[in-house]
Design a protein with these regions (language model features):
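Intrinsic-disorder-associated, low-complexity terminal segments enriched in Asp/Asn/His/Tyr and depleted
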Residues: 2, 23, 27-30
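N-terminal amphipathic/hydrophobic targeting modules at extreme N-termini
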Residues: 10-25, 37
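N-terminal regulatory/effector-sensing and dimerization cores
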Residues: 23, 79-177
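A short, N-terminal "cap"/entry segment at the start of jelly-roll beta-barrel domains
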Residues: 31-83, 96-97, 179-183, 205
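Amphipathic alpha-helical segments enriched in hydrophobic/aromatic residues interleaved with Lys/Arg
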Residues: 48-61, 165-222, 226, 252-254
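Basic/polar phosphate-binding segments, predominantly the helix-turn-helix DNA-binding elements
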Residues: 222, 226-232, 239-241, 257-259, ...
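Short alpha-helical segment immediately N-terminal to, or the first helix within
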Residues: 255-259, 306-310
Length: 352
């Protein structure tokens, strides 16, 4: 009986409260006679429009912030290392010729314009609103394909923390269950609005010492987590899956980088990561877009170019330091790759 009375009382209360909310306008002074209308049928379309606008605002916020940072740094054309965030910001007002460089594990957001990037066997074109994710250290060829003074090519490069990715991986649902049909270590996708928002917050947090120390690391963790569950999660999960070709080749590339001046013995390197010579060569090319020997040669030449522009060592000393036994061979291969002799390159400004 008591329970029945209690239930009756609750139902009565709910009915009264509902009635009050339904008639709420008449309790307000000078309230309009018009009642609240039922949600129209086009509300779903309206919500989609609002969502698109919100995503567009996030993109514009990030572009405006990066542009302001470049302006403050006085960089009208070129690259800028933003020390507080650890990122690199880029702006170009004209298209560029092909340029050889090294990509390390990174996220690159194209905010305006477009660029082309690739290896000797693969080429990708990525434009505004898209991102590149690079899982391995790679020698690449790139060029800016869309840029003008009115709409300059603008991008940001966010370096990836592989240790942080590995710590997050166990909590992430796997999107792969075996080797991928395309293990290439550069992935391309549309930029996720949530990722743009996190990057914008990261930049803002890096402006003040207190938020840079307390909040920015948390947001950096969020950015890495979003990459593991986003559109290009496969690129990074392949790297973190220890039985994948990407993971094994990562070990091989790391060995080559650490022993750059030493001669590569393919059989020894293949055995080090548990592959036959033929499987190693095939998987290495699939992941990096080049052969082991060409990979080492490209890294040697790029390292030599940096050394020439940042030190006063003789050309022959630079050549021997990166593993060349012949200064003449070094000069020939250097000129073939960069279109300039080592001595000519020494006169140029350091590359950012």
């Amino acid at each position: 009986m008591h329970i029945r009375l209690l239930c009756y009382g609750v139902i009565t209360l709910v009915v009264k409260v509902t009635s009050i909310f339904h008639d709420w306008p008449k309790y307000l002074p000078n309230s309009p006679k018009k009642q609240i209308s039922v949600m129209p049928e086009h509300a779903t379309l309206l919500s989609l429009d609002v969502g698109w606008e919100a995503n567009n605002v996030k993109s514009q916020n990030l572009l405006s912030h990066v542009t302001a940072l470049l302006d403050q740094a006085g960089v009208a054309d070129g690259a800028f290392h933003h020390a507080h965030s650890g990122t690199h910001l880029l702006r170009h007002t004209t298209t560029t010729d092909l340029n050889a460089t090294i990509y390390r594990p990174l996220l690159c957001l194209i905010l305006q314009g477009a660029k082309q990037v690739g290896s000797s066997t693969r080429t990708l074109t990525v434009g505004a609103g898209q991102s590149l994710i690079v899982s391995h250290t790679l020698p690449v060829i790139s060029r800016i394909t869309e840029a003008s003074s009115e709409v300059p090519y603008t991008a940001l490069v966010f370096p990836l923390d592989l240790d942080l990715l590995r710590s997050l991986a166990p909590a992430v649902p796997p999107v792969i269950s075996g080797p991928s049909s395309d293990p290439f270590s550069i992935g391309q996708c549309d930029t996720d609005p949530g990722l743009e928002d996190a990057l914008y917050r990261f930049f803002v947090q890096c402006e003040e010492e207190e938020t840079r120390q307390l909040l920015a690391p948390i947001t950096s963790r969020e950015i890495h987590a979003r990459l593991l569950i986003g559109q290009q999660a496969k690129v990074l999960q392949r790297l973190l899956w220890h039985e994948s070709a990407a993971s094994r080749i990562f070990l091989a590339t790391r060995h080559i980088q650490a022993n750059l001046s030493e001669t590569i013995v393919v059989g020894d390197l293949a055995a080090r990561i548990g592959l036959s010579n033929s499987a190693f060569f095939e998987q290495f090319k699939a992941v990096t877009g080049t052969s082991p020997l060409q990979y080492q040669k490209d890294l040697r030449l790029l390292k030599a170019r940096d050394d020439l522009r940042t030190s006063r060592a003789k050309v022959s000393e630079v050549a021997f330091a990166v593993g060349y036994e012949s200064s003449a061979q070094f000069s020939r291969e250097y000129s073939r790759k960069f279109g300039r002799s080592p001595r000519q390159d020494r006169e140029l400004e350091p590359i950012n």
